[in-house]
Swiss-Prot record:
InterPro entries: HD, HMBOX1, HNF-1_N, HNF-1_POU, HNF_P1, Homeodomain-like_sf, Lambda_DNA-bd_dom_sf. Transcriptional repressor which maintains cell fate asymmetry of AWC neurons in adults by repressing the expression of multiple AWC (OFF) genes, including srsx-3 in the AWC (ON) neuron. This is Homeobox-containing protein 1. Residues 215-291 bind DNA. It comes from Caenorhabditis elegans. Belongs to the HMBOX1 homeobox family. The keyword DNA-binding applies. Residues 1-30 form the HNF-p1 domain. One of its GO terms (molecular function) is double-stranded telomeric DNA binding. Transmembrane segments: none annotated. Residues 293-310 have a biased composition (Low complexity).
């Protein structure tokens, strides 16, 4: 038969008082007598506020000492019982009252026993994955610890963790049903959970209707000296294991005691390994966020500079006129490809003999404005255009034709040269 550490300590204390095994059996029998009484208030008080044997602290003697057990009822504020709840454990118990001596591996029958056994079957019909999800939401909403659930259900904490993580196949069906019954009972009767809660840091409360009030976990406030210490530890080991976290927590508590000049630390000031783990996780998350922001900023700056350069080039190209483009293309052409004729401001044009009057035997020079004269060698079409502006007809020979003249009449051409050239 296996015993817990607490049970072994109690057995040793009882042995030190000089009690025999028969006296122990008789004492346990006397403790079971109040459970058979009909007075519910007396039963609840006897279970919740038992007095230890008065000879536990007396020195060991050779003669057997008579065992006396005395139970004193604790003042309890009674509430009217509901129609569907007749258990004496329905009454809320004062938080400062002594709690019963109970093995941590023994399930609480009053919490794991349902009023209606069919309720468990109806609950499990939706599938165990959905059952675990509902129970996990309930535990997270009310900030319950896995150790508290393990103590109430009689299942060890690692198996509670496996169940909540979805590895329910590693637990026996009996253990799973026991946990499900605990969840259904606490969900239906929140005052049971508030009364039997053994973890003082959770501090569950109920409202006027007997429903649980969700509690927010208290945030740990780090002092500057702790932040400096944790920063130094983070540079050494960003991912500390459990022994390392325990070492860091002990070092932080030691520094806090020195900072308070030997004054004891309050419960909310004590640094636990879980607090260290949370701080390291938040620190790693902050570093990842900063790195992501820096990379995003560098990428956006590079893209903006590239887009501004492209816009500048497009503006420079679009600002050039067709004449500028032609001039720039001509300027980029080698000099050997173009043989411009020297610029002249005046030249003589001879009129045809048929058009010139008989009295005038010579032609007079004509002055052409400088704006009409192109800067490069003009083409034949440009020459005809200038001649039209000046009112002069030019019988220019066309070397590719046999007659060496243009194949159309000159008079219509000077009137509308575009239509003539288009028709031809």
């Amino acid at each position: 038969m296996l015993f817990t550490i607490e049970q072994l300590e109690l057995i040793k204390k009882l042995q030190h008082t000089g009690m025999s095994s028969d006296q122990l059996l008789k004492a346990f029998g006397e403790l079971e007598v109040p459970e058979q009484l009909q007075n519910n208030n007396t039963i609840a008080a006897a279970l919740y506020s038992p007095l230890l044997v008065q000879h536990l602290t007396t020195p060991k003697s050779e003669t057997p000492v008579k065992l006396t057990v005395q139970t004193v009822p604790t003042p309890v504020k009674s509430e009217p019982q509901s129609s569907n709840c007749s258990s004496p454990f329905e009454h809320p118990i004062c938080s400062n009252a002594p709690r019963p001596i109970r093995s941590q591996r023994t399930p609480m029958k009053e919490i794991t026993t349902l009023d209606d056994p069919n309720e468990l079957e109806e609950f499990m019909k939706q599938g165990e994955e959905a059952c675990i999800l509902d129970m996990k939401t309930f535990i997270t909403q009310y900030s319950l610890r896995q150790t508290t659930v393990a103590m109430m259900t009689g299942v060890s904490q690692p198996y509670i963790s496996k169940l909540l993580n979805g590895n329910h196949r590693e637990l026996s069906l009996r253990c799973r049903k026991n946990i499900y019954c605990w969840y259904l009972n606490c969900r239906r009767h929140p005052n049971k959970l508030a009364a039997f809660l053994a973890d003082p840091t959770t501090r569950l409360e109920t409202n006027g209707d007997g429903e649980l009030i969700p509690q927010r976990r208290e945030r740990y406030v780090f002092r500057p000296i702790l932040i400096r210490m944790l920063e130094s530890f983070f540079t050494q080991t960003p991912f500390p294991d459990l022994p390392r976290r325990v070492e860091i927590a002990n070092a932080c508590n030691h520094v806090l005691k020195m900072d308070k000049k030997g004054v004891g630390l309050m419960p909310k000031e004590v640094v636990s390994p879980q607090v260290v783990s949370n701080w390291f996780a938040n620190k790693r998350k902050e570093l990842r966020r900063r790195s992501a922001e820096a990379s995003a900023a560098s990428t956006s700056s590079a893209s903006s500079s590239a887009s501004s350069t492209a816009n500048h080039d497009s503006v420079s190209v679009s600002s050039m006129s067709p004449r500028d483009e032609e001039t720039s293309s001509r300027n980029t052409t080698p000099e050997t490809a173009i043989s411009p004729s020297p610029a002249v401001s005046t030249f003589e044009v001879s009129r045809p003999s048929a058009i010139i009057s008989a009295t005038s035997s010579t032609t007079s020079p004509i002055s052409i404005p400088a704006t009409i004269i192109p800067s490069v060698s003009p083409s034949a079409l440009e020459l005809f255009a200038m001649a039209q502006q000046l009112g002069v007809q030019l019988p220019v020979p066309f070397p590719t034709l046999p007659t060496h003249f243009f194949p159309f009449q000159m008079a219509p051409f000077y009137g509308n040269p575009a239509s003539i050239l288009k028709s031809e």
